[in-house]
A protein has these predicted regions:
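Short, charged, intrinsically disordered terminal tails
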Residues: 73-79
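N-terminal acidic leader/helix
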Residues: 2-28
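Short, charge-rich amphipathic interface segments used for partner binding and complex assembly
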Residues: 29-73
Length: 81
């Protein structure tokens, strides 16, 4: 089996965040991964289109985690916007 590309690895890591129960922790982790994803692009490990795809997935996940957190009736304790 061929080794996964950096894009596939990063996408898998983002997908893994969907399993987290704590939406606020998932948001923090998502924000922490942003610079890592950018570094993959700057180091030419992912293509421009792959970077755009990862950013789009990240933005969608951010909205999902915010909605999850707000659905609990508890305030967000971080500046996410």
């Amino acid at each position: 089996m061929p080794e996964k590309s950096e894009f596939d690895k990063a996408l898998g890591e983002l997908h893994d965040l969907t399993e987290w129960e704590d939406a606020e922790a998932a948001l923090r982790e998502l924000h922490a991964r942003g610079p890592e994803i950018e570094r993959l692009y700057l180091d030419s490990k992912i293509l421009p289109g792959e970077l755009r795809a990862l950013v789009m997935v990240s933005n969608c996940l951010e909205r999902e985690f915010i909605h999850r957190r707000l659905a609990t009736g508890q305030p967000l304790h971080m500046n996410v916007l």
